[in-house]
C-alpha cells in the first residue's frame, strides 16, 4: 500500500511560469517541465510509477499556482484502479489558483477494474480573474477484454470555489452491478466523462460550436455555471470522448485567450 504525496508550487519570474517547489514521494513523480507554448505556460506531466492504485492506497496532491502563472497538467498514462483487497483506495487533490492565474487540468482516463473500491476528492479554490479547465474520463471495467464493473464502488467529489462561494459541487457514486445497466446510472455504457470550464462568460455561439460534433455516445452541454461551461459524456469509446474534450479545449483556448492550443506530446501515444 502506498501513501504517496505530491506538492507543486508555480511562480512567475521574468514573465515566465516556473515550478518553484516540488515535493514528491513514491509512487508519485513529476517530469521536468516543458514549454512548447512559450515560457508563460508550463506543461507538467505527473507519473504514477507503481502502475496502478490498490486498496488502502492514499494519494494526496497539493498544487498552488501563484498570481499570474499559467500551467497545463496531465498524466503520463491512463490511471488504473485494481480490484480491492477489502480496503478503499483514495485520491485527494487540493488546487489553489491565485489571482489572474490559469490551470488546465487534463489527465488521461482512469480505468476502474471490476471489484475496485475507489474514492476521489478534488477541490479547487480560485482567485479573482483566475480560470480553470478540468476534465475527468472514467472507464468502468476493462471492456476491451469483455470485463464489466459488476462489483465494487466508485465515488467522485468535485468542488470549485471562489472567494468562499461554491461555483461547482458535483458528487457521484456508482456501485458495480445493476447501476451499470440502469438509465440513471451508465445505461449499459462503460465510460463517462465530465469537462468543466470556469473563467470568462460563455456565449451561445460557443455553446453551439461545442455541440456541433457527431458522437455515438450521449452528451450534454450547458453554460449554467455562470462564467463557465459544463460538458458531459456517456458512451463506450475512449477515443471519442478524448477527441471531443480535446476539441472543446482547443475551442476555449481560441475563444478565451486568442491562442491555439498545442497538444502535449505525451498524448501522441493515445
From Swiss-Prot:
Molecular function, one GO term: nickel cation binding
Predominant cellular place of this UniProt entry's protein: cytoplasm
Subcellular location: Cytoplasm
A Gene Ontology term for the protein's cellular component: cytoplasm
InterPro entries reported in the protein's UniProt record: UreD
Keywords: Chaperone, Cytoplasm, Nickel insertion
Purpose: Required for maturation of urease via the functional incorporation of the urease nickel metallocenter.
Family the UniProt entry places it in: Belongs to the UreD family.
Subunit structure: UreD, UreF and UreG form a complex that acts as a GTP-hydrolysis-dependent molecular chaperone, activating the urease apoprotein by helping to assemble the nickel containing metallocenter of UreC. The UreE protein probably delivers the nickel.
Name by which UniProt lists this protein: Urease accessory protein UreD
Organism listed in the record: Microcystis aeruginosa (strain NIES-843 / IAM M-2473)
